[in-house]
Protein backbone atom coordinates (compact mmCIF):
# COMPACT_ATOMS: atom_id res chain seq x y z
CA UNK A 1 0.00 0.00 0.00
CA UNK A 2 1.27 3.47 -0.83
CA UNK A 3 2.05 6.11 1.79
CA UNK A 4 -0.89 8.14 0.51
CA UNK A 5 -3.26 5.23 0.98
CA UNK A 6 -1.95 4.53 4.46
CA UNK A 7 -2.41 8.15 5.51
CA UNK A 8 -5.96 8.10 4.17
CA UNK A 9 -6.93 5.30 6.55
CA UNK A 10 -7.39 6.36 10.16
CA UNK A 11 -9.40 5.42 13.24
CA UNK A 12 -11.63 8.30 14.36
CA UNK A 13 -14.03 7.80 17.27
CA UNK A 14 -14.92 11.49 17.54
CA UNK A 15 -15.87 12.80 14.10
CA UNK A 16 -17.71 11.41 11.11
CA UNK A 17 -20.44 8.80 11.34
CA UNK A 18 -19.22 7.46 14.68
CA UNK A 19 -19.37 10.84 16.38
CA UNK A 20 -22.73 11.63 14.82
CA UNK A 21 -24.31 8.43 16.12
CA UNK A 22 -23.02 9.15 19.60
CA UNK A 23 -24.22 12.77 19.64
CA UNK A 24 -27.60 12.10 18.03
CA UNK A 25 -28.46 8.98 20.00
CA UNK A 26 -28.98 7.05 16.75
CA UNK A 27 -26.75 4.27 18.05
CA UNK A 28 -29.44 3.18 20.50
CA UNK A 29 -31.50 1.61 17.71
CA UNK A 30 -28.58 -0.10 15.95
CA UNK A 31 -29.19 -3.72 14.92
CA UNK A 32 -25.87 -4.73 16.49
CA UNK A 33 -27.24 -3.91 19.93
CA UNK A 34 -30.22 -6.20 19.33
CA UNK A 35 -27.95 -8.96 18.07
CA UNK A 36 -25.56 -8.79 21.03
CA UNK A 37 -28.17 -8.02 23.67
CA UNK A 38 -26.20 -5.00 24.87
CA UNK A 39 -28.15 -2.07 26.31
CA UNK A 40 -27.64 0.66 28.88
CA UNK A 41 -29.43 -1.57 31.39
CA UNK A 42 -27.49 -4.67 30.32
CA UNK A 43 -23.80 -3.72 29.97
CA UNK A 44 -22.35 -7.05 28.89
CA UNK A 45 -18.75 -8.05 28.29
CA UNK A 46 -18.08 -8.45 24.56
CA UNK A 47 -15.03 -9.79 22.74
CA UNK A 48 -14.68 -8.26 19.27
CA UNK A 49 -12.63 -10.99 17.59
CA UNK A 50 -12.01 -8.93 14.44
CA UNK A 51 -11.63 -5.37 15.67
CA UNK A 52 -10.87 -3.69 12.34
CA UNK A 53 -11.40 0.05 12.66
CA UNK A 54 -13.11 -0.42 16.02
CA UNK A 55 -16.42 1.23 15.24
CA UNK A 56 -18.65 -1.61 16.38
CA UNK A 57 -16.62 -1.92 19.57
CA UNK A 58 -16.97 1.80 20.25
CA UNK A 59 -20.72 1.59 19.66
CA UNK A 60 -21.03 -1.23 22.17
CA UNK A 61 -18.81 0.55 24.70
CA UNK A 62 -20.87 3.73 24.32
CA UNK A 63 -23.85 1.71 25.54
CA UNK A 64 -21.95 0.59 28.62
CA UNK A 65 -20.47 -2.69 27.43
CA UNK A 66 -16.95 -3.71 28.36
CA UNK A 67 -15.27 -4.58 25.07
CA UNK A 68 -12.08 -6.47 24.31
CA UNK A 69 -10.80 -5.76 20.80
CA UNK A 70 -8.59 -8.41 19.18
CA UNK A 71 -6.73 -7.37 16.03
CA UNK A 72 -4.08 -9.49 14.33
CA UNK A 73 -2.87 -6.99 11.73
CA UNK A 74 0.05 -4.96 13.14
CA UNK A 75 -0.86 -1.99 10.93
CA UNK A 76 -4.52 -1.93 11.95
CA UNK A 77 -3.60 -2.53 15.60
CA UNK A 78 -1.36 0.55 15.44
CA UNK A 79 -4.17 2.63 13.91
CA UNK A 80 -6.54 1.48 16.64
CA UNK A 81 -4.06 2.34 19.37
CA UNK A 82 -3.63 5.83 17.91
CA UNK A 83 -7.39 6.30 17.59
CA UNK A 84 -8.05 5.21 21.16
CA UNK A 85 -5.33 7.50 22.49
CA UNK A 86 -6.71 10.48 20.57
CA UNK A 87 -10.27 9.74 21.70
CA UNK A 88 -9.21 9.46 25.33
CA UNK A 89 -7.86 13.02 25.20
CA UNK A 90 -10.99 14.43 23.51
CA UNK A 91 -13.41 14.77 26.44
CA UNK A 92 -14.40 13.15 29.71
CA UNK A 93 -17.40 11.51 28.01
CA UNK A 94 -15.31 9.94 25.26
CA UNK A 95 -12.57 8.99 27.73
CA UNK A 96 -15.12 7.10 29.83
CA UNK A 97 -16.18 5.10 26.77
CA UNK A 98 -12.59 4.32 25.77
CA UNK A 99 -11.85 3.19 29.34
CA UNK A 100 -14.22 0.28 28.70
CA UNK A 101 -12.23 -0.80 25.62
CA UNK A 102 -9.20 -3.10 25.86
CA UNK A 103 -7.04 -3.63 22.76
CA UNK A 104 -5.07 -6.84 22.23
CA UNK A 105 -2.75 -7.63 19.34
CA UNK A 106 -3.04 -11.29 18.38
CA UNK A 107 -4.93 -13.99 16.53
CA UNK A 108 -8.40 -14.53 17.98
CA UNK A 109 -8.28 -18.21 17.06
CA UNK A 110 -5.49 -18.68 19.59
CA UNK A 111 -6.77 -16.19 22.17
CA UNK A 112 -10.44 -17.16 22.40
CA UNK A 113 -9.81 -20.50 24.16
CA UNK A 114 -8.04 -18.59 26.95
CA UNK A 115 -10.77 -15.99 27.54
CA UNK A 116 -14.43 -15.73 28.44
CA UNK A 117 -17.16 -13.17 27.87
CA UNK A 118 -20.89 -12.81 27.46
CA UNK A 119 -20.70 -12.29 23.69
CA UNK A 120 -18.16 -12.81 20.91
CA UNK A 121 -18.59 -10.80 17.71
CA UNK A 122 -16.98 -11.68 14.37
CA UNK A 123 -16.90 -9.21 11.47
CA UNK A 124 -14.54 -10.62 8.83
CA UNK A 125 -13.65 -9.12 5.49
CA UNK A 126 -16.83 -9.75 3.56
CA UNK A 127 -16.83 -11.27 0.07
CA UNK A 128 -15.98 -8.60 -2.52
CA UNK A 129 -18.99 -7.17 -4.30
CA UNK A 130 -19.21 -7.41 -8.06
CA UNK A 131 -19.98 -3.69 -8.22
CA UNK A 132 -16.85 -2.37 -6.57
CA UNK A 133 -18.14 1.21 -6.72
CA UNK A 134 -20.54 0.25 -3.95
CA UNK A 135 -17.65 -0.48 -1.61
CA UNK A 136 -16.63 2.55 0.42
CA UNK A 137 -13.12 3.84 -0.20
CA UNK A 138 -12.23 3.29 3.43
CA UNK A 139 -13.12 -0.39 3.26
CA UNK A 140 -11.16 -0.78 0.04
CA UNK A 141 -8.11 0.67 1.78
CA UNK A 142 -8.62 -1.66 4.72
CA UNK A 143 -8.91 -4.64 2.39
CA UNK A 144 -5.67 -3.60 0.68
CA UNK A 145 -3.95 -3.43 4.06
CA UNK A 146 -5.11 -6.72 5.61
CA UNK A 147 -6.23 -8.78 2.61
CA UNK A 148 -9.07 -11.30 2.67
CA UNK A 149 -10.04 -13.56 5.57
CA UNK A 150 -9.84 -17.09 4.10
CA UNK A 151 -9.78 -18.57 7.60
CA UNK A 152 -13.05 -17.04 8.77
CA UNK A 153 -14.68 -20.47 9.13
CA UNK A 154 -11.85 -21.53 11.46
CA UNK A 155 -12.32 -18.34 13.48
CA UNK A 156 -16.04 -18.96 13.75
CA UNK A 157 -15.42 -22.52 14.92
CA UNK A 158 -13.14 -21.16 17.64
CA UNK A 159 -15.78 -18.59 18.62
CA UNK A 160 -18.56 -21.16 18.74
CA UNK A 161 -16.71 -23.26 21.32
CA UNK A 162 -15.51 -20.25 23.34
CA UNK A 163 -16.73 -19.53 26.87
CA UNK A 164 -19.54 -17.16 25.93
CA UNK A 165 -23.30 -16.98 25.86
CA UNK A 166 -23.63 -16.11 22.19
CA UNK A 167 -21.65 -15.50 19.03
CA UNK A 168 -22.66 -12.81 16.52
CA UNK A 169 -21.43 -12.97 12.91
CA UNK A 170 -21.77 -9.80 10.84
CA UNK A 171 -22.37 -10.78 7.23
CA UNK A 172 -23.63 -9.16 3.99
CA UNK A 173 -27.41 -8.98 3.97
CA UNK A 174 -27.98 -11.10 0.87
CA UNK A 175 -24.86 -13.25 0.96
CA UNK A 176 -25.04 -17.01 1.25
CA UNK A 177 -24.54 -18.33 4.79
CA UNK A 178 -20.94 -18.93 5.78
CA UNK A 179 -20.03 -22.49 4.87
CA UNK A 180 -18.47 -24.88 7.34
CA UNK A 181 -20.35 -23.84 10.48
CA UNK A 182 -23.69 -24.69 12.04
CA UNK A 183 -26.86 -22.78 11.29
CA UNK A 184 -27.49 -19.65 13.37
CA UNK A 185 -30.13 -19.63 16.09
CA UNK A 186 -31.68 -16.56 14.44
CA UNK A 187 -30.84 -13.57 12.27
CA UNK A 188 -31.28 -9.81 12.65
CA UNK A 189 -31.26 -7.79 9.44
CA UNK A 190 -29.83 -4.31 9.05
CA UNK A 191 -29.86 -2.12 5.95
CA UNK A 192 -26.87 -3.68 4.20
CA UNK A 193 -25.72 -6.40 6.59
CA UNK A 194 -27.28 -9.04 8.76
CA UNK A 195 -26.27 -10.47 12.10
CA UNK A 196 -26.28 -14.25 12.40
CA UNK A 197 -26.71 -15.02 16.09
CA UNK A 198 -25.54 -18.33 17.55
CA UNK A 199 -26.81 -18.90 21.08
CA UNK A 200 -24.80 -21.23 23.29
CA UNK A 201 -27.02 -23.27 25.61
CA UNK A 202 -24.61 -23.11 28.53
CA UNK A 203 -23.34 -19.97 30.23
CA UNK A 204 -19.56 -19.60 30.59
CA UNK A 205 -17.96 -20.87 33.78
CA UNK A 206 -16.94 -17.66 35.50
CA UNK A 207 -14.20 -19.24 37.61
CA UNK A 208 -12.56 -21.32 34.89
CA UNK A 209 -10.83 -18.68 32.78
CA UNK A 210 -9.82 -15.02 33.09
CA UNK A 211 -12.17 -12.44 31.67
CA UNK A 212 -10.50 -10.50 28.90
CA UNK A 213 -11.17 -7.18 30.61
CA UNK A 214 -8.91 -8.33 33.47
CA UNK A 215 -5.91 -8.16 31.13
CA UNK A 216 -4.93 -4.65 32.23
CA UNK A 217 -1.55 -5.09 30.58
CA UNK A 218 -3.17 -4.56 27.20
CA UNK A 219 -5.45 -1.67 28.11
CA UNK A 220 -5.15 1.61 26.16
Swiss-Prot record:
Keywords: Cytoplasm, Methyltransferase, rRNA processing, S-adenosyl-L-methionine, Transferase
Entry's Gene Ontology cellular component terms: cytoplasm
EC number: 2.1.1.242
Chain sites annotated for binding S-adenosyl-L-methionine: 55-56, 71-72, 123
Catalytic activity, reaction form: guanosine(1516) in 16S rRNA + S-adenosyl-L-methionine = N(2)-methylguanosine(1516) in 16S rRNA + S-adenosyl-L-homocysteine + H(+)
Pfam families documented for this protein: SAM_MT
Annotated InterPro entries: 16SrRNA_methylTrfase_J (IPR007536), SAM-dependent_MTases_sf (IPR029063)
Highest taxon of source: Bacteria
Main location: cytoplasm
GO molecular function, one term: rRNA (guanine-N2-)-methyltransferase activity
Free-text function comment from the UniProt entry: Specifically methylates the guanosine in position 1516 of 16S rRNA.
Name of the molecule in the record: Ribosomal RNA small subunit methyltransferase J
Species per Swiss-Prot/TrEMBL record: Rhodopseudomonas palustris (strain BisB5)
Lineage, broadest ranks: Bacteria, Pseudomonadati, Pseudomonadota, Alphaproteobacteria, Hyphomicrobiales
Amino acid sequence: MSAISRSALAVDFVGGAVGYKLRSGAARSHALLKATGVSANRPLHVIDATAGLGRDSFLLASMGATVTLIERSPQVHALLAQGLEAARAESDEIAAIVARMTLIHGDARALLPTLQADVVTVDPMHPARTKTALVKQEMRLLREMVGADPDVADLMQAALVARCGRVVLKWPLRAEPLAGIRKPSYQIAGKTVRYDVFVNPRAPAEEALPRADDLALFRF
